Amino acid sequence: MKLTFLGTGAAIPTKYRAHPSISLKFDGEIFLFDCGENTQRQIIFTDVSPMKINNIFISHLHGDHVLGIPGLLQSIAFQGRTKPLNIYGPEETAKMIKNILNVGYHSIDYPINVYEISSKTSEKIISTDNYDVFSFPVVHSVPAVAYVFRQVKKPRMDLEKVNKLGIEIGPDLKRLKDGYNVELNGKIITPEDVTLPPKKGICVGYSGDTIPLNEFADFLKELKCTILIHEATFDKTMDKNAKETLHSTVHDALNIAKRSGANTVILTHISARYDELSAFEKDVVEFKVEHPDLHVLIAEDLMEYSLKGKWVKM
């Protein structure tokens, strides 16, 4: 699994930060969280393949989070895309996509499936054998949702028990791995007889734009979140501005991360007012005095975060 931060800015882009967009690569598939203006150009500087984007998750319909969609849709059409593209977002997302497709001359020959998500209740919006995706309602100036991507880990085979029961590599072992009972020498063997509990999988939360919500932190804790990407539009001294605009400060984001039980928090959606990050770094240092175990990172454009927890400069 690898995260690529395509854009880490806020409402107004800067020389150093593009509008919000984050790619999550998992099992050869790309999941895109928000798609701000210039996203497709940012992708050029990474190893993200636009043709492998199957799902786009929109947190809310402010322009800085969605204005990259028209260009991306057209570009992947030019590249010959035929497989469906799924777009998830809060209420009015379908209307927005319809308006996009009705402006200009688009030749899009692949299916676009739009799924509107409630901004009032949490939902499991995707469920597969390998991963689940959840939405959670957050509080912003327009309907908004956060997302959680959770890897599904299957039970591991206990080779000692397998050997003890005399199960050989073959159809019986495969059936047990797939969750079915088998009969061996007149005895029924269940998957539970030969498996160990699954290891903890990777679970990534993305806040979108929001005020700090303890309810969101508790939801993340329930899902055993390991990495939280949380907006931190302002530093601690701008708390009044954060409250007025329904955003979060660095301290807000760090407190939510600590409450959620996440190992790592990555701060993003940095206001254009910050040419440098000394105020952010000061807030992080102060917080870590009392919470040294929390791994804190401030995202930068075109930075990657790998499964092994390492930053990679593109």
Curated annotation (Swiss-Prot):
It comes from the Archaea. NCBIfam families: PRK00055.1-3, RNase_Z. GO terms for molecular function: 3'-tRNA processing endoribonuclease activity; zinc ion binding. Zn(2+) 1 binds at H60, H62, H140, D209. Its EC number is 3.1.26.11. Zinc phosphodiesterase, which displays some tRNA 3'-processing endonuclease activity. Probably involved in tRNA maturation, by removing a 3'-trailer from precursor tRNA. It is an enzyme of class 3 (hydrolase). The gene is rnz. Its cofactor is Zn(2+). Belongs to the RNase Z family. Homodimer. This is Ribonuclease Z. Keywords: Endonuclease, Hydrolase, Metal-binding, Nuclease, tRNA processing, Zinc. It comes from Methanococcus maripaludis (strain C5 / ATCC BAA-1333). It catalyses: Endonucleolytic cleavage of RNA, removing extra 3' nucleotides from tRNA precursor, generating 3' termini of tRNAs. A 3'-hydroxy group is left at the tRNA terminus and a 5'-phosphoryl group is left at the trailer molecule. The active site is at D64 (proton acceptor). Zn(2+) 2 binds at D64, H65, D209, H269. Binds 2 Zn(2+) ions. Pfam families: Lactamase_B_4.
